[in-house]
């Protein structure tokens, strides 16, 4: 009971990051836009699982559509406040075509799904193209890049703390958040694998893969690659870094995460980024 109540810090954090980001965007303070992206989205599934396990299913729909509301409101305000539309490049046109193409299938009588199911699927598919246009229309000068980097590094450290707890107890964090029950009820996915979660949480031989507070180990590994890219930038500009201790902790956190997420692709990416880093700083002897 106590653990369940303590875990509510995740949905509360999600809600606070959403509210703070919406308020900032409404006021035109786009420098705070990243708060929801960094502090909210990574714990989205975990927050929903915890709400479900605490019997708070009534508020889950509000959380489920919050990210779409954030995207639509942010994009709408950006377009409304634009002095003039930008010149569209080939990637912009590709994204627009993609959204229109997928929207057509909502109206066409194809497949066994009803209109509601198609609209929900379209909502999920369109999320990242709309997110792309937010980044496309944002003026980079309005963003606080250094704060964004710091937020991502702090996220990596917190992820490693949860991961360290998983390693000490040899227990997936998702087993106490209600992950399996949530997926079974809302997505009709029966628990699979040796640990009652899904096969994604283990590799051959039943060796555990850990996800920290992310939705699954693959998402955990992918987020670590973003952290690594920022670490490379920070290490190259180490003399200008105002948070050397945070940089060090983030390095340790990324190593821990990339090892125990057990993702071959992410490990290869980690080694590739490390190789490029040593090439950039002209320390080729370390590589051999």
Language-model regions, residue ranges each:
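Interfacial loop-to-transmembrane-helix boundary motif in multi-pass membrane proteins
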Residues: 26-39, 87-101, 135-167, 171, ...
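Transmembrane helix-loop junctions in multipass membrane proteins, especially transporters and channels
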Residues: 53, 83, 110-114, 140, ...
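N-terminal hydrophobic segments of proteins, predominantly signal-anchor/transmembrane helices
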Residues: 30-52, 58, 62-129
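Membrane-embedded alpha-helical segments of multi-pass membrane proteins
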Residues: 7-17, 43, 60-79, 122-130, ...
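Transmembrane alpha-helical segments and their membrane-water interfaces
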Residues: 10-24, 71-85, 105-168
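Signature aromatic-anchored transmembrane alpha helix within multi-pass, membrane-resident enzymes
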Residues: 153, 287-288
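Membrane-interface helix-loop-helix junctions at transmembrane boundaries of multi-pass membrane enzymes
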Residues: 22-32, 79-94, 233-249, 283-287
């Amino acid at each position: 009971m106590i653990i369940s109540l303590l875990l509510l810090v995740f949905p509360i954090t999600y809600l606070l990051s959403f509210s703070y980001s919406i308020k900032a965007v409404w006021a035109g303070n786009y420098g705070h836009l990243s708060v929801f992206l960094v502090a909210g989205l990574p714990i989205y599934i975990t927050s929903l699982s915890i709400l479900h396990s605490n019997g708070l299913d009534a508020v889950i729909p509000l959380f489920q559509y919050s990210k779409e509301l954030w995207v639509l409101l942010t994009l709408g305000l950006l377009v409304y406040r634009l002095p003039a539309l930008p010149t569209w490049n080939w990637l912009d046109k590709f994204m627009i075509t993609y959204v229109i193409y997928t929207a057509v299938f909502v109206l066409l009588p194809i497949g066994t799904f009803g209109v509601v199911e198609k609209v929900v699927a379209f909502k999920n598919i369109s999320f990242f193209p709309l997110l792309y246009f937010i980044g496309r229309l944002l003026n980079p000068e309005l963003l606080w890049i250094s704060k964004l980097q710091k937020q991502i590094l702090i996220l990596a450290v917190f992820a490693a703390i949860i991961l360290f707890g998983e390693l000490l107890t040899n227990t997936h964090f998702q087993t106490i958040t209600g992950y399996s029950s949530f997926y079974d009820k809302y997505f009709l996915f029966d628990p699979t694998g040796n640990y009652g979660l899904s096969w994604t949480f283990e590799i051959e031989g039943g060796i555990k893969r850990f996800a920290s507070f992310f939705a699954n180990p693959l998402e955990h590994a992918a987020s670590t690659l973003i952290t690594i890219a920022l670490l490379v930038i920070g290490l190259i500009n180490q003399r200008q870094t105002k948070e050397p201790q945070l940089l060090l902790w983030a390095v340790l956190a990324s190593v821990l995460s990339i090892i125990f997420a057990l993702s071959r692709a992410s490990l290869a990416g980690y080694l590739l980024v490390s190789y490029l880093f040593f090439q950039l700083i002209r320390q080729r002897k370390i590589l051999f």
